[in-house]
Amino acid sequence: MTTKTKKILLICALTLSAAVLLFFGFKKGVELYNAKNADELFTAGDYAGAREWYEKNGSAEDIARCDYELDREAYEAAAAQLAAGEYDAARLAFEALGDFEDAADRALECILFKARALTDAGSYTDALDVLAALPEDHTGAQELTEEAREGLYQQALAATYECRMDEAVMLWNSLGSYKDSDSLLKRCMSRIVSMAAGTEERINYSPYAGRDVGDGILYWHRLGLIYVPKECNADTRCMIFYPGGYDSALANSYYQDYIYAGTSPNAIILYMYTNGFYDIESHIEDAYRALEEAALENNVFLHDMVVCGASNGAYTAVNTAAYLYENYGIAVRYVLTFDAGAHWAHTDKVLTPEQCDLAAEAGTEFLLFEGAGIGMNKSAIHTMVRHGCDVTIVLCRNSGHYGIIYDAIYKGMLDWVLGNGEQPTDANYTYIPLDITSTYPE
């Protein structure tokens, strides 16, 4: 190889080396430039752009920094959606964040907030559907579920009392088992069948005495007299009045006195001719069916029930509270007894412990109108109190049999229990609530 050739090869080698160095220097310069730009993108908040470069050329730490910031932005956007009431979008956004900070908890919070909004808007069925997605132990879930169920219960109750039966059945089915919903659903379905079939015995073809009484009409029925307001509504109450005697057909003039007194209660009232003393359950069933017929014809759903009984009718009255609750789910609000026959000595006619339990569960208040000396010394009353019944002795100054009844009629007692006035507080009455430690009044 000549000297000239060697020089040429050396020059080529040097040129190639310079080119290589220049290339790698340029490449490194570009990388440094791009890295600087990626950092600037990150600093400027373009985490997606920065991550794109870091994914090709950066470190895992750089990528993790971008991922965190991207998740943080998504978290803040989801929080803004939640604050704006966009509950479904916010929940999906939080769920997409997986285990980022408390995103999983916030996703559940979206469910709770949506249920809260639906409950506040009265959309209780939808609220309960939403709440079903929450764990039972989630903070606030049980309380809100109870609130929504109670709201739906009241909606169903309103539809029931207003005799919107198809709607009521739908609402009761949506609610499921809650309080007395099962029995109310059964009664609504029975009412729908009755509405389609009509009543067995119409009560309104023969008005008693052929004239109106106050704001209502007194109708004849084979079991007694039925007073019906001319304008019934969802607030119309119901009352059964059992007379005294040993199941003999007595003059019923003092039943009518309450109506003729001009009070005109918003209540359907059945004045029974007899008290069924010798066949109490059968008589109660007959009374219920007669009252249900009257209610059906006047588009009233039996509720807010009051039952009264004089003398031996007192035994039928107290039994009515347990019977109606057990068989029809009807909670009798008040039972009023007036001078119970034989001073509660007919122990085979009084409530059993099991019946007392039913009346206590129904929340029935027993008001026993008596003269002096009647109270916990009577085994019938003692059993009722011992088994949780709400019993009050109403000690009457006018303690004669008819005096007790007339005072209740003319001094506002029936008005009060039928929602038309205040509880009488005059000197004629002394109210003595009983508990297991009570003694009988002297």
Model-derived features: positions:
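N-terminal Sec-pathway targeting helices
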Residues: 1-17, 21
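A domain-start/cap signature at the N-terminus of enzymes
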Residues: 186-236, 426-442
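Short beta-strand element of the alpha/beta-hydrolase
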Residues: 235-245
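Short amphipathic alpha-helix adjacent to the substrate-entry channel of hydrolases
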Residues: 251-269
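Alpha/beta-hydrolase active-site loop
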Residues: 278-298
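Primarily recognizes the serine-hydrolase "nucleophile elbow" in alpha/beta-hydrolase
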Residues: 296, 303-358
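The feature captures the conserved acid-bearing segment of alpha/beta-hydrolase catalytic domains
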Residues: 334, 339-414, 418-421
